Amino acid sequence: MQNLCYQLKVIPAFNSNIYRLLELDGSCTFAALSDLILDAFEFNHDHLYMFSLGRKPYDPNGIYSPGGRAEKRADRVRLQDVAPVKRNKYLYLYDFGDEWIFYLSLIHI
């Protein structure tokens, strides 16, 4: 299977005037995507996180950071595993205490 390149636009909920464009291979795990987002916004890598494919914080069907009890672990699920579709929107929640929320949009495959 050929790995496709995905372009994501990441907008922090705390400041919608800024964004980052990330390009990554479809074989990239959600754990690696978390690292890319944190690096792009200069955050430390010291809290738990989750991704929601339906933009719902604490989504029971979400993809959670490794080490928890979630069925879908971010270090095991790849971007291409969730059958991303152009213009799909996702939520990334970092730090369950401070709840830093980022909105992700798939803008190009």
What are the residue ranges of the model-derived segments?
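Short coil-to-beta-strand transition motifs
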Residues: 97-103
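Short, hydrophobic/aromatic-rich segments at coil-to-beta transitions
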Residues: 4-6, 84-91
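Eukaryote-biased recognition of intrinsically disordered, low-complexity regulatory segments
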Residues: 2-20
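Short loop-to-beta-strand transition segments
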Residues: 41-57
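Eukaryotic mixed-charge, acidic/polar low-complexity intrinsically disordered regions
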Residues: 60-88
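Short, contiguous acidic and Ser/Thr-rich linear segments
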Residues: 16-31
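Conserved small/polar residues in nucleotide/adenosyl-binding loops
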Residues: 107-109
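Short amphipathic, charge-patterned alpha-helical segments
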Residues: 29-43
